[in-house]
């Protein structure tokens, strides 16, 4: 198989009509398939697929738990049964709503509480900034205290004790700026092969480039290439891919509650089409709206709504969450000290991680920081 694949790569390399970035991506994909033992027939019989589907259904029904990767948010996990393998999930909002904070809350739960390996590609913030946010969430010390280093003796002790679980978490952060979709796919394959990654986060989609394959196209075509490749990556690695996305300014100009809708997605056509799940983060408090637009007119202070606007394989819902701005994290609105009552089917053992390699450091990038507070 290796000789056959190598011959195909060499033959394609002589074809001057081939785009070099597409060729590199195709070559790495074929070599990755060999290392993973994925060389198989391109088609399967209905009988074989039915047997596989029945086996999966039986595995889920015979155990009390989720079939996917748990987010840590109870109502969301009940709706989705966890983030499913091969799904592309879009989490979108206007700047300042807390996209990064929400996904960090999920990543913290997956890696610290459930020992599920997660890859986090941060194109906006440096890896040190992300880790500082996680330390704030884990220790209960405000981001302001951590930024200034103005800690009391007992707070230093609190920091040293509580950060140990974070040090050993199977979380892998890459903060390469202006990452191309082909570079991201190559990095994701290596992380999957080396660490058994079960979920990938990209923060955020509009900061990516399509590489050389779309150099003459417009931005909408470039976003289309990126979203299509992210969906292909989720299927290739058989893991959920969560891509954060910005919303257009149309949300700000609209009257009423300013709750986002699907058409608010930037370059929305391709993103909406490729995604299996499209969600929005909405905080009325951000717009100085002090109560929810429901019958009870309950106060909206310190609360957010996680809107599942598209769900290819399930239902839709608007899920209320608690937002702790001082710590930059989201929690279940009820009983958030015990965020999740089920057990995920995802293999939680994962590879053993060297604490010195668990986090990749990077340079600070202060501009354009998507801070929710």
Language-model segment annotations:
Residues 1-62, 97, 116, 139-141, ...:
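Short, small/acidic-rich helices and loops at N termini and domain boundaries
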Residues 201, 240-245:
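Structural recognition of the conserved hydrophobic beta-strand(s) that form the central parallel beta-sheet
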Residues 78, 109-196, 210, 319, ...:
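Cytosolic-facing regulatory segments adjacent to core modules
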Residues 73-82:
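Pre-Walker A adenine-sensing motif
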Residues 204:
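Walker B catalytic acidic pair
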Residues 182-197, 214, 228-237, 250-373:
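C-terminal regions of RecA-like/P-loop NTPase motor modules
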Residues 143-152, 172-178, 209-224, 251-263:
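Flexible beta-alpha connector loops of hexameric P-loop NTPases
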Residues 82-126, 179-193, 198-201, 221-229, ...:
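P-loop NTPase nucleotide-binding module
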